[in-house]
Amino acid sequence: MDINEKVLLLAILKKESNESLNDIVLKLENTGMFSLKEGKKLLKKLKTEQFISDSFLTLKGDAIAKNVEQEFKI
């Protein structure tokens, strides 16, 4: 899993209840993390790999996102 995927999963974990996945991608695009096209491609990949379902993390996605959070705290 590359750094962009990790950051996106963490951002989804930390998203506000009124934010959509597209809002998260747009925020990360504004920071220069990746382009909108790349962000949407990453979302699709994470959905295909069953890290995301609808607008939420799956149990698998949640576990990975929490590991990423710990990784970034170091």
Predicted regions and their residues:
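Short amphipathic alpha-helical interface segments
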Residues: D2-T31
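Alpha-helix N-cap and coil->helix boundary residues
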Residues: E19-D23, K37-E38, F56
